[in-house]
């Protein structure tokens, strides 16, 4: 079933006024850092420099840098003792599955999982004793403990976006195919969609199936996948240029509109709908849901800021802004309210405790 774009008829005069830059959003380059970053700045081990993404399940954090994923707590991060898991650099973004305590990645030969329990290997290997970059007795940088990813589902085509739902269903898409495969109980169902999938999330819902969303940056759309009947949902345009998407609370999705300088809150039951949009002072890329405060955090790369928003009945309200490290393209909010931000071009992770 093909999704239907939900949009009103646009008169030619309005269509002509649409910006040529619509779609294909990328992070706006950061200026040189002038102001001291807020909170604590932690240097990463060399193999985890230039972070491409962050995610978390509870207090366990996943730090991705190309072909390596570091897993552990903030304390292990501070001590330079994250457990490293090698992955194919061609694997897509990490998604979190709290129900099974594993981080999920779509890769060229299938969908892989990284259990949060691999963080225990740091203690098994001697605990959090060596700081990042500290030399071992032999004069070489101390080696980080390692673990291996687990193949959850072999696929006959490369996967670049994958999620595993609370009930155990696996949804697998690709940035160069117009379909999403669903794996359940050894059977595969293929859903036709209108555009390839650049990113996908599954958001738990109490007492029901997860809400699954996907985005395409070229056409700047967001679409829900009907989990119960394994079909494509409706499609909505995300402003002028969707950047990233992240889970919120109870089936909610949060998406940044990088070109339009705003973020949207999306909900779905039978059909996806836009709940509200909130303008941002800078150009947003990374976005995170703060479950403790029931608030939204957004990183704006063009001014090196991390902003906190309160959602209301209308549009959200900016509460405060923190100075960030350069090129903050990854952002998470932990259960205790701690905020982690990572640079895509540097070697640092920023820890903010509001």
Give residue ranges: language-model regions:
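C-terminal motif of bacterial Sec signal peptides marking the signal peptidase cleavage site
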Residues: 5-8
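Bacterial signal peptide processing site
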Residues: 10-13
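A short beta-strand motif characteristic of beta-propeller blades
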Residues: 32-46, 78-86, 145-153, 186-193, ...
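Beta-strand-rich domains and repeat architectures in extracellular enzymes and scaffolds
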Residues: 40-67, 91
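Repeated scaffold domains used in trafficking and secretory/extracellular systems
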Residues: 46-54, 87-99, 155-165, 195-205, ...
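Short coil/turn segments that connect the beta-strands within blades of beta-propeller domains
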Residues: 57-59, 99-101, 167-168, 209-210, ...
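Short loop/turn segments that connect beta-strands within beta-propeller blades
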Residues: 74-77, 116-119, 183-186, 226-230, ...
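Blade-level signature of beta-propeller repeat domains, shared across WD40, Kelch, NHL, RCC1
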Residues: 328-354
């Amino acid at each position: 079933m093909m999704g239907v774009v939900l949009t009103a008829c646009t008169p030619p005069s309005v269509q002509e006024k649409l910006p040529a830059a619509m779609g294909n959003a990328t992070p706006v380059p950061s200026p040189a850092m002038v102001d001291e970053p807020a909170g604590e700045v932690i240097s990463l081990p060399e193999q985890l420099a230039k972070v491409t993404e962050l995610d978390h399940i509870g207090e366990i954090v996943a730090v991705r840098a190309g072909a390596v994923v570091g897993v552990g707590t903030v304390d292990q991060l501070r001590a330079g003792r994250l457990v490293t898991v090698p992955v194919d650099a061609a694997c897509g973004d990490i998604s979190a599955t709290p129900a099974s305590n594993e981080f999920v990645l779509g890769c060229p030969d299938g969908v892989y999982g990284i259990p949060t329990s691999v963080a225990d290997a740091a203690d098994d290997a001697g605990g959090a004793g060596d700081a990042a970059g500290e030399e071992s007795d032999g004069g070489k940088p101390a080696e980080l403990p390692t673990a291996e990813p687990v193949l959850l589902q072999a696929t006959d085509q490369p996967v670049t976006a994958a999620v595993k739902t609370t009930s155990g269903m696996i949804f697998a898409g690709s940035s160069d195919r117009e379909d999403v495969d669903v794996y359940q109980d050894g059977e595969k169902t293929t859903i036709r969609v209108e555009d390839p999938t650049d990113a996908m999330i599954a958001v738990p819902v109490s007492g029901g199936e997860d809400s699954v969303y996907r985005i395409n940056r070229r056409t700047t759309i967001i679409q829900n996948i009907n989990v119960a009947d394994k079909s494509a949902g409706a499609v909505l345009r995300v402003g002028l240029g969707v950047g990233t998407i992240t889970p919120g609370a109870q089936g909610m999705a949060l998406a940044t509109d990088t070109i339009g300088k705003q973020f949207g809150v999306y909900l779905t039951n039978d059909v996806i709908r836009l709940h509200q949009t909130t303008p941002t002072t800078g150009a947003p890329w990374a976005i995170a849901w703060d479950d403790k405060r029931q608030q939204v955090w957004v990183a704006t790369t063009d001014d090196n800021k991390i902003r906190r928003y309160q959602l209301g009945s209308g549009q959200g309200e900016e509460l405060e802004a923190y100075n960030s490290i350069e090129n903050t393209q990854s952002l998470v909010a932990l259960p205790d309210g701690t905020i982690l931000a990572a640079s895509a071009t540097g070697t640092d992770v920023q820890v903010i405790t509001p």
